[in-house]
Amino acid sequence: MKNESLLSIWIEAKHIIEPLCEDLPVLTDEPGDWRVETPSGRPFITLRIQKSHVGLYVLPMYYHPHIRPRSMDAYLKGKSTFRFVRTKPLPVEGIQDIIERARAMIGTY
């Protein structure tokens, strides 16, 4: 884990995302690193503590950028990565929305 002080943000984000992915295979489940894949074995999402942020990597969004809710623009870094830091509250509804939209793309990327 690159920064233990971000563990509370990571845990909060995981608690938001995990129920939306409960039927998908979990590849890694360690403190600070959680990876989920599709039933066919493609990467789906990764939630990982980095040096200065908690990153949410949403692979379907890389191929289908139109699924990104505009409410998440302030957190977007790159094509399919969201960064969460201590200074901003987690956008619970935005996270739920992006995971639901990404699930609809399973099998199309």
Language model: regions and residue ranges:
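Charge-dense, helix-prone N-terminal extensions
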Residues: M1-Y109
